[in-house]
């Protein structure tokens, strides 16, 4: 969890609603309007900033749901929790605590945290989350296939399924918190599931080590099995000091975003042009460089837009955590433009993390959903983005 407050890298900010965390930055006022999108803040931990208030939603990060239309599961990096919502933001009663290394669930988990007076021990720091389509990844200590799987900045991967005791605790299935050494363990920023010729695997972006760590199904020890790939997810042309930050499975290919590491190799260093995106197959072979520098600024969220998403229908959308902007690319990796608001200003979402199409309970698969950790990751936001009407007249 980053402790540094981040600026939006913009010379001006326009608040779209009273107390809103959504802003439009006036960096490029001279260009003509090319597109228009509207943001709906659904859930926030801060009163008045969204339709629903949930104090547990701090630094909202990864999002997952089942194809059968489960609620949206949203990882709360600041509170060590995964909270559940409908597509309209209605909260579901279940919330799941993510354990620290050693399967410890601190009392602070799934409770609001004061960043100026953090608890000791602090809760876990979940990031990426996936719905598990495989029966081969079991919750440790059970014969239950995991339903949702969570990665953390603590260097762990945890699993959850219905029927656990207690029912609201995930269980650690892989622990690299001390690998290669205590105090220098893995920092997982993202997680996806993918299929290769060898079967189903989990792929975790290890920001500290600069690797994609791969896990196969449950082994004889009851834990997920470390795996290797033929290609190793290597790109010798990525500059030193950059590491895998986000990861997404788009049409069977793995898109990996790279951000600049800070001195501790725990958090990113935001800045214009600080970012790269590569495309790999699920056996770790580099297929192509998709994007380099340019509009990228600590890119993390990435998805393909629906084919009912206005001017950017079907395009690859890449969200910048560093400045909160959303960039549209064609399939070749050619940058097209940024998303604008209805007034022609670049759309900015402070602390932007996930971009994902709908599909969870009460949502449309044409709607783009997002999460964010505004105000230096101390607060949280879950919402959606849809095409907007451009105002007419002066």
Which residues fall in each region the model found?
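Sequence/structural signature of beta-propeller domains
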Residues: 26-394
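Bacterial N-terminal signal peptides
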Residues: 10-20
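Bacterial N-terminal signal peptides that target proteins for export
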Residues: 1-12
């Amino acid at each position: 969890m980053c402790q540094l407050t981040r600026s939006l890298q913009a010379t001006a900010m326009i608040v779209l609603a009273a107390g809103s965390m959504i802003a439009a930055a006036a960096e490029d006022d001279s260009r003509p309007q090319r597109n228009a999108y509207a943001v709906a803040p659904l859930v926030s931990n801060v009163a008045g900033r969204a339709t629903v208030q949930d104090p547990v939603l701090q630094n909202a990060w990864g999002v997952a749901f089942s194809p059968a239309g489960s609620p949206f599961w949203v990882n709360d990096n600041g509170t060590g929790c995964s909270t559940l919502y409908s597509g309209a933001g209605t909260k579901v009663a279940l919330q799941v605590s993510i354990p620290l290394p050693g399967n410890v669930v601190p009392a602070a988990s799934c409770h609001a945290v004061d960043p100026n007076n953090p608890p000791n021990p602090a809760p876990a720091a979940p990031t990426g989350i996936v719905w598990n389509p495989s029966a081969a990844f079991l919750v440790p200590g059970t014969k239950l296939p995991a339903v949702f799987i969570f990665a953390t900045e603590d260097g762990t991967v945890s699993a959850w399924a219905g029927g656990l005791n207690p029912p609201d605790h995930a269980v650690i299935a892989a622990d690299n918190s001390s690998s290669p050494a205590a105090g220098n363990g893995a920092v997982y920023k993202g997680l996806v599931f993918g299929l290769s010729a060898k079967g189903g695997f989990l792929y975790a972006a290890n920001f500290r080590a600069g690797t994609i760590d791969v896990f196969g199904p449950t082994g004889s020890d009851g834990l997920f099995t470390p795996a290797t790939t033929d290609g190793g997810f290597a790109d010798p042309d990525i500059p030193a000091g950059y590491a895998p930050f986000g990861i997404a499975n788009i049409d069977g290919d793995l898109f990996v975003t790279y951000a600049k590491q800070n001195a501790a190799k725990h958090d990113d260093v935001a800045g214009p042009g600080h970012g790269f995106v590569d495309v790999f197959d699920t056996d770790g072979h580099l297929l192509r460089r998709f994007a380099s520098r340019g509009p990228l600024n600590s890119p993390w969220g990435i998805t393909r837009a629906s084919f009912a998403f206005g001017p950017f229908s079907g395009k690859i959308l890449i969200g910048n955590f560093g400045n909160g902007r959303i960039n549209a690319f064609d399939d070749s990796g050619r940058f097209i433009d940024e998303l604008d608001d209805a007034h022609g200003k670049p759309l900015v979402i402070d602390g932007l993390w996930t971009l994902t199409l709908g599909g969870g309970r009460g949502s449309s698969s044409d709607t783009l959903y997002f999460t964010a950790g505004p105000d230096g990751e101390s607060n949280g936001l879950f919402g959606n983005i849809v095409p907007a009407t451009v105002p007419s007249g002066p």
